Amino acid sequence: MAVPKRKQSPSRTGMRRAQNMKFKSTNIVEDKKSGEYRLPHHLDLKTGMYRGRQVLDPKE
């Protein structure tokens, strides 16, 4: 079984792991009622709606 000769530094470990997270994109959805783009599971700041309920007063 292969065994590493030297301990890998935390910096090298972080650099290796950073390659996996390089191209993660955020998932953006279009709101059905207003047509605005927002993050999923977040309320629409323009209308103040979240899951069909009025949570905030809409901005004017």
From Swiss-Prot:
Q: A Gene Ontology CC term for this entry?
A: large ribosomal subunit
Query: Where is the region Disordered?
Result: 1-20
Kindly list the GO molecular function terms attached to this UniProt entry.
structural constituent of ribosome
The Gene Ontology biological process terms listed for this entry are:
translation
What's the short name of a Pfam family annotated to this entry? Ribosomal_L32p
Q: Keyword set for this entry? A: Ribonucleoprotein, Ribosomal protein
Is RNA-binding included in the keywords of this UniProt record? no
InterPro entries named among the record's database cross-references: Ribosomal_bL32, Ribosomal_bL32_bact, Ribosomal_zn-bd
> Does the record bear Transcription regulation in its keywords?
no
Q: Which SUPFAM superfamilies match?
A: Zn-binding ribosomal proteins (SSF57829)
Task: Cite the NCBIfam families for this sequence.
Answer: rpmF_bact
Q: Which PANTHER family match?
A: 50S RIBOSOMAL PROTEIN L32, LARGE RIBOSOMAL SUBUNIT PROTEIN BL32
User: Into which family does the record put it?
Assistant: Belongs to the bacterial ribosomal protein bL32 family.
Q: What is this protein called?
A: Large ribosomal subunit protein bL32
Q: What organism is this sequence from?
A: Pelagibacter ubique (strain HTCC1062)
Taxonomic classification: Bacteria, Pseudomonadati, Pseudomonadota, Alphaproteobacteria, Candidatus Pelagibacterales
